[in-house]
């Protein structure tokens, strides 16, 4: 019996993420959501701030016990570059506020019942937000990433829900990434992203591999040059540095949404 339990424990550890992988997932989510925040700002014309993510492990019972009821589950499936899906969870009121703002309202029309119009609007918002996040992910993984149109559903966690019908990975343990989201003075709330653990590992491995390739490229570029190639290499080096400077500037602007900088509302 002891041997079996030890084996189970080892198997469980293999299924979970290491601390390094959790950090990597947090950084991936941070950059992706930063890009998504910029897109949401353009849709609602209000200041959008999304906080640094908190990465943890969770299961369906934890979600039912801790999150507001009812809520909206938005499934994002990857069609190119990654194999899998993740789920974004928003509170019902937040969906109503975003939908009202998208339709030209002031964000206070939240009394009516959540219906197909809200779900259609939030699906379109998430299509644009997660599409821009996929573009950021493409840069991090150095390959094309694409998604299918997100599908939004109302889920009342007070009722008995077959989580397997929402997505099979919800029947076991999964990665939960929590963000604080602020939209002007209308929303100060928590949103969640739920990832299957194998999918999270795949993203981490992709980022690590891309970083290794970048490191090898830098090492090759930094090798000493001798002979008559010195002058030519000096010219090449100075021109090669220009894109790097541009990339740094792009990185700085890319970080702005994470800090809530796109403030024109």
Regions found by a protein language model. Give the residues of each.
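Composition-driven recognition of glycine/serine/threonine/acidic- and proline-rich low-complexity segments
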Residues: 3-14, 18-233
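Intrinsically disordered, low-complexity repeat regions enriched in Pro/Gln/Gly/Tyr
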Residues: 212-265
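Intrinsically disordered, compositionally biased charged tails
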Residues: 1-2, 244
